[in-house]
Amino acid sequence: MNYQILARKWRPQSFKKIIGQKYIVKAISNGFSLGKIHHAWLLSGTRGVGKTTIARLIAKSLNCEIGITSLPCRKCTICQEIEKGICLDFIEIDAASRTKVEEIREILDNIYYTPSKSRFKVYLIDEVHMLSRHSFNALLKTLEEPPQHIKFILATTDVEKIPKTIRSRCLHFKLNILSEEDIFNFLKHILKKGGNNFDEEALKIISDYANGSMRDALNLLEHAMHLSKNNINLKNTTEMLGIPNKKHAFLLTKFLLEQDSKKMMCLLNKISKIGLEWQNILIEMMRFLHHIAMLKSYPKIWNQIFIKNNENEIKKIAENNSKYNIQLCYKILLKGRKELFFSPNHKMGVEMILLQAITEIKR
């Protein structure tokens, strides 16, 4: 059975299908339409935002048999070979595993050979920031005056580690992290196409926990599909991610602001038996604190878009607590989350963070 993971199955095969990178797609497409073809592109951004996908589309656009175009045909031999990853003139190099200058020089020595059957020989150097200083120096000489038949695409998740001399010789595009809305809509589209049942709340959680990465979102979605036999529901999704249910997160936040440490510790002990990611408890509490703070500051506006669960109780909490205390708790939880991994165990860390917040609340 030829099963394809979602990230490969749904990889965009045209610039029009790229999500969340409108400006970059427009700039690259216009460059091809105007015949202004740069010799080197630098694509930077976090994981799963489309760097490799855009690089492959650039390679197809440069080498499509109908001509240089922003709309490659996908039917010619070159387009199909690039999509399958078997094109001899599109060379993908993982810089993380080829950091030595000797290896880079060996690659660069071959660039003077003409393409086997394409218009251009395209080199994609992924994670280029991993190259050594000597490797960058070797690459710099080629980037200054490359042969006419050579194009470079550099991809990185850490652009600051790339020397300025390299960056200045490339057309640099900084890819944005994807919005939760874009990720949610795409996941929804995939599930509808596949005829899967799903809970929109579960998709919203997956979209949020993907942290702007479409690949992470698709991997989480695939995990959820396997767990629930293609029926994505809220219960399985929260258990999969180790997220406390909203009721527990709300009650912990309520007890915190009421300075009721006894009830808070009893609930934490109850939660510990379920088996959750402890940092997720802090994250969900911070969400409630954010909602309470916004309701406190903008009651008329925020009330219209506020979550419906526990609405009356949340309004009461907002009325009974000062902006200072709400902000203070948020700040302590935020700092505590960063330092949680230094505690002897995460449960102990969360308990101490919440006790500190209770101690510092002013009445």
UniProtKB/Swiss-Prot annotation:
- Reported EC number(s) for this entry are 2.7.7.7
- Keyword annotations for this protein? ATP-binding, DNA replication, DNA-directed DNA polymerase, Metal-binding, Nucleotide-binding, Nucleotidyltransferase, Transferase, Zinc
Where along this sequence does the record place binding of ATP?
45-52
Coiled coil (residue ranges): none
Q: Name one GO biological process term.
A: DNA-templated DNA replication
Catalyzed reaction equations: DNA(n) + a 2'-deoxyribonucleoside 5'-triphosphate = DNA(n+1) + diphosphate
Per UniProt, where does Zn(2+) bind?
A: 64, 73, 76, 79
Report whether Transferase shows up as a keyword of the record: yes
Q: Which Pfam families match?
A: DNA_pol3_delta2, DNA_pol3_gamma3, DNAX_ATPase_lid
Q: Which SUPFAM superfamilies match?
A: P-loop containing nucleoside triphosphate hydrolases, post-AAA+ oligomerization domain-like
Q: Does the keyword field hold Metal-binding?
A: yes
One Gene Ontology cellular component annotation held by this UniProt entry: DNA polymerase III complex
In alphabetical order, the GO MF annotations are: ATP binding; ATP hydrolysis activity; DNA binding; DNA-directed DNA polymerase activity; metal ion binding
What does this protein do, in the record's words?
Answer: DNA polymerase III is a complex, multichain enzyme responsible for most of the replicative synthesis in bacteria. This DNA polymerase also exhibits 3' to 5' exonuclease activity.
Q: What family does this chain come from, according to its entry?
A: Belongs to the DnaX/STICHEL family.
Q: How does it assemble?
A: DNA polymerase III contains a core (composed of alpha, epsilon and theta chains) that associates with a tau subunit. This core dimerizes to form the POLIII' complex. PolIII' associates with the gamma complex (composed of gamma, delta, delta', psi and chi chains) and with the beta chain to form the complete DNA polymerase III complex.
Please give the name of this protein. DNA polymerase III subunit gamma
Q: Which classification does the entry list for the species?
A: Bacteria, Pseudomonadati, Pseudomonadota, Gammaproteobacteria, Enterobacterales
Name of the coding gene: dnaX
